[in-house]
A protein has these predicted regions:
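A fold-wide structural signal in alpha/beta-hydrolase
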Residues: 66, 95-99
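Catalytic nucleophile-loop/oxyanion-hole region of alpha/beta-hydrolase
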Residues: 79-80, 86-87, 99-135, 273-279
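Short beta-strand element of the alpha/beta-hydrolase
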Residues: 64-73
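Gly/Ala-rich beta-loop-alpha elbow adjacent to hydrolase catalytic centers
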Residues: 140, 144, 148
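A glycine/proline-hinged amphipathic helix-loop "lid/cap" segment
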Residues: 1-58, 295
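Alpha/beta hydrolase fold serine-hydrolase catalytic domain that processes acyl esters and thioesters
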Residues: 134, 149-295
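Short beta-strand-to-loop junctions in surface cap/lid or active-site-entrance loops
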Residues: 52-63, 218-223
């Protein structure tokens, strides 16, 4: 189909909706199995909320900069195993301690369970041996990117661990996207309006009243005091408009923002087509921005 980046080749067979309510348990099981197989070889820690954290350390005693990186999965599924290669690269190439936390999923565990799990992981990381607490970044992919943005807001508001930088890859930021006119589903891949609405409905099912910014960062009233950011998204991503708008709001508030827009890229492109030149360039830019912010 025309309109997708040519580096991705034929995308006709890529699903428009990677997960459905009826297949959610299967996806969770398969990712948990993969996580068990890979996680046995990774250092593990446990947060104050009893959630496991995968830990990747660079060579040397430190103190090292650190990255708390949250996996994607639409707030309803996922596992650190999908971020294993990226975490190893960051530890080796940037010399940072990388923490991949697990967190609660909707609809069984709605807001604020997931973000509180992320906050507990941030507190653990700030106090971890070999970590320089003045050089901590938060980031994530998709739902993890949205949680990272929410975490920066929560840490600011609570006076919690200092965050130097936020690295937001195609973040899931705005619950109001489910109420807007849906784009043509033929123009997107992996994540579409139907599953997005179902995921947000489950995540926010216990919210009574206005949706807080720590649930949906696009509801943020006052950006002042948030850390500088690198924010990236594809133009064929359902989240494109909300991500672009959020980056613009941060920049308008005087927060340094590097907004990277990939023409013709769909949601999940950097994982699904990781060998495409445009994907490699995108990930290289992410890592370069992280290195510059932390070192």
């Amino acid at each position: 189909m025309s309109g997708f980046h040519p580096d991705f080749g034929n995308v006709d067979r890529l699903t428009k909706q990677a997960v459905r309510p009826g297949t959610l348990r299967v996806y969770r099981f398969l990712l948990a199995l993969g996580g068990w197989l890979v996680g046995r070889r990774v250092e593990q820690a446990v947060s104050s909320r009893g959630r496991r954290i995968w830990v990747y350390r660079p060579e040397g005693d430190g103190p090292h900069p650190a990255l708390l990186w949250l996996h994607g999965g639409g707030l309803i599924f996922g596992n650190p195993v999908t971020e294993h290669d990226f975490a190893r690269q960051v530890a080796a190439e940037i010399g940072a301690v990388v923490a991949l936390p697990t967190y609660a999923f909707a609809p069984e565990r709605p807001y604020p369970a997931g973000i509180e799990d992320a906050y507990a992981a941030l507190e653990w990381l700030a106090a971890a041996p070999g970590v320089d607490p003045a050089r901590i970044a938060v980031g994530g992919d998709s739902a993890g990117g949205g949680l990272a943005a929410a975490l920066a807001i929560m840490a600011r508001d609570r006076g919690g661990p200092a965050i130097r930088f936020q690295l937001l890859h195609e973040p899931m930021l705005d619950e109001a996207t489910r109420t807007r006119p849906a784009p043509d589903p033929e123009t997107m891949r992996m994540w579409n309006p139907a599953i997005n609405t179902w995921a947000w409905d489950g995540y926010l099912r216990d919210v009574d009243g206005p949706v807080p910014a720590t649930a949906s960062p696009s509801r943020l009233a006052e950006p002042a005091g948030l850390p500088r950011a690198w924010i990236g998204v594809g133009t064929r991503d359902l989240f494109h408009a909300e991500v672009r708008d959020y980056a613009g709001r941060l920049a308008a508030a005087g927060i340094p923002v590097d907004f990277h827009e990939v023409e013709g890229a769909f949601h999940g492109f950097a994982a699904v087509r990781k060998d495409a030149p445009v994907s490699k360039d995108y990930v290289a830019r992410m890592k370069a921005a992280l290195a510059a912010a932390l070192n």
